A protein has these predicted regions:
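Short linear interaction motifs
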Residues: 87-108, 305
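Switch/communication elements of ASCE P-loop NTPase nucleotide-binding domains
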Residues: 1-64, 70, 263-412
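Globular "head" domains of long coiled-coil molecular machines
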Residues: 68-69, 125
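Acidic, Mg2+-coordinating catalytic modules of nucleic-acid enzymes
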Residues: 1, 22, 99-100, 106-116, ...
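Extended helical coiled-coil dimerization/tether regions that scaffold
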Residues: 158, 165-305, 311-323
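ABC nucleotide-binding domain signature
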Residues: 29, 116-117
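A structural detector for beta-sheet-dominated domains
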Residues: 9, 20-22, 67, 76-78, ...
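Conserved nucleotide-sensing/catalytic segment adjacent to the nucleotide-binding pocket
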Residues: 70-94, 401, 407-408
Length: 481
């Protein structure tokens, strides 16, 4: 799906806020100071689409236009007037008609195939928004559905291990190479019966499950080394036996291949088992590339987990027509990964996914936007108690990080640190003073020059724009210009 226009008239500090999306390129980034509503915008969009899914609009006014599955959709919601109108391809649709089509994924719905969310801060706010969907998803699982894929995927750090297992199972090695991961060792999945299991009534292998979960349990049972072993200590329920499946990565890949034929993936299956409280725990060691050293997944850095949750999660979500909402997915990344982030996204999403989906990133990182066009960036700022989201004048691409920092994007007075900049400003004030310097001022100027001489290479080569400015200022004062 492609977002085209959104107007929000009153969600938290988003008062009369409008964004017009003028490019089909991904990602779209939102930058701005703290308090300019970047995270609130992500939440508001999530509220809108959860509301559309259930036919129950959120308690704020909005107007949205987007395209999905070859349809043009426009929705207006007014809390004050009590009006909620939906048009599809210019024709008004009843709420029942729209809701019916949205909930029927096989009918090319006027809705994203999937909404993928990553939120770097406290997750409670996002979890509360999708709480109703989580209940619906659990109901679907309990009713033995064959379709176990989530419409709203909320990826967070706690799921990094499932995503890593999924990447191995489906042979997506590009991100693993970046993370220095060669393979996994000693994979164990600890499972227990669902609450609905009755020992005297249900079969002991599949625990009375049906649909996609039963098929997946059969896949595990057939692939596991020596099938399975009882392991009661992993069970949280003393009256229900647990079991452990031990699966080598070769057999894990075979499970992945079987799931792919059914249009599923291991990540979504593990999510389904966890939702049914069948998956108790997973264990494995990571084999480091090159050295073959083993280490536990808990040893992964926060940045590595963040990459797994976003880039890895998107790699496994093979749907087209998606809405991807990422709130500060770069908080723990080193500069090298931030610099490569746009290409990592391209690596995760197929060309068709990029063409038919919208990815929105809220960020503070100048490196993240350094390779984008101006149409891919919104600058959030406050104006008369309103939040304005406007497009920049120049492309960030080609400017370099130092110039981006001092440009309209971030507006810093200098790309140098504050103390060095203060020394430069003081030197300029003394050097260009019209009156003769006092002995004390001359001594201070010499002291500053000595300090700056030590940093000479840093100033000359890391901030050439400032050096050029300083030389120009000297030339003007000397009458050479």
């Amino acid at each position: 799906m492609k977002l085209e226009y959104i107007h929000i008239a009153g969600y938290k500090n988003l008062i009369d806020t409008t964004l017009v999306f003028e490019t089909s390129e991904n990602p779209i980034t939102i930058i701005g100071n703290n308090g300019t509503g970047k995270s609130n915008l992500i939440e508001a969009l999530l509220h809108v689409f959860v509301g559309l899914y259930y036919g129950k609009p959120p308690e704020f006014d909005y107007h949205i236009r987007y395209a999905a599955h070859n349809k043009q959709i426009e929705v207006r919601n007014s809390v004050h007037d009590g009006s909620y109108t939906v048009t599809v391809d210019g024709m008004p649709w009843s709420h029942a008609q729209f809701n019916r089509r949205v909930r029927s994924p096989q009918q090319m719905p006027p809705f994203p195939s999937q909404v993928f969310i990553y939120y770097s801060g406290t997750c409670d706010r996002v979890e509360n928004i999708v709480k109703k969907y989580n209940r619906s998803y659990l109901y679907k699982l309990k009713n033995q559905s064959d379709d176990l894929e989530r419409q709203f995927v909320f990826s967070d750090i706690s799921q990094a291990e499932w995503i890593l297992l999924g990447l191995i199972a489906h042979r997506h090695h590009a991100l693993l190479i970046d993370l220095g991961i060669d393979d996994l060792h000693g994979v164990k999945l600890m499972l227990q019966p669902p609450e609905s299991y009755v020992r005297d009534r249900d079969d002991p292998i599949y625990w009375g499950t049906e649909g996609g979960i039963r098929e997946f349990l059969a896949d595990l049972h057939n692939a596991a080394d020596e099938n399975y072993e009882p392991f009661a200590k992993y069970s949280g329920r003393s009256n229900r036996e647990a079991r452990v499946y031990r699966i080598g990565t070769v057999k894990l890949e075979k499970v992945g291949a079987v799931l792919e034929k059914r249009g599923a993936n291991l990540y979504s299956m593990l999510q389904a088992l966890a939702a049914r409280q069948i998956l108790v725990k997973n264990e494995f060691d990571i084999i480091q590339k090159g050295s073959r050293n083993h280490y536990r997944p808990e040893s992964l850095s926060e940045g590595e987990k963040q990459l797994l949750c976003v880039i890895g999660g998107l790699t496994l979500a093979q749907n087209t027509e998606c809405l991807v909402l990422l709130d500060e997915p770069d908080t723990h990344l080193n500069p090298a990964w931030s610099w490569r982030y746009n290409n990592l996204l391209k690596q995760a999403l197929t060309s068709q996914q990029r063409t038919t989906s919208t990815t929105i990133i809220a960020t503070h990182d100048p490196i993240m936007i350094s390779g984008l066009t101006k149409e891919q960036v919104f600058i959030a700022r406050k104006e008369n108690e309103r939040l304005i989201y406007e497009s920049p004048v120049r492309d960030p691409r080609g400017q370099g990080v130092a110039n981006i920092l001092v440009s309209e994007y971030f507006g810093l007075p200098s790309s140098l640190d504050e103390n060095t900049q203060m020394l430069l400003d003081e030197r300029l004030q003394l050097a260009y003073k019209k009156e003769r310097l006092t002995d004390e001022e001359s001594a201070r100027l010499s002291e500053i020059n000595n300090q700056l001489d030590i940093l000479g290479l840093s100033i000359s080569f890391r901030d050439p724009a400032y050096k050029e400015f300083e030389e120009q200022k000297f030339a003007v004062l000397e009458g050479r210009v």
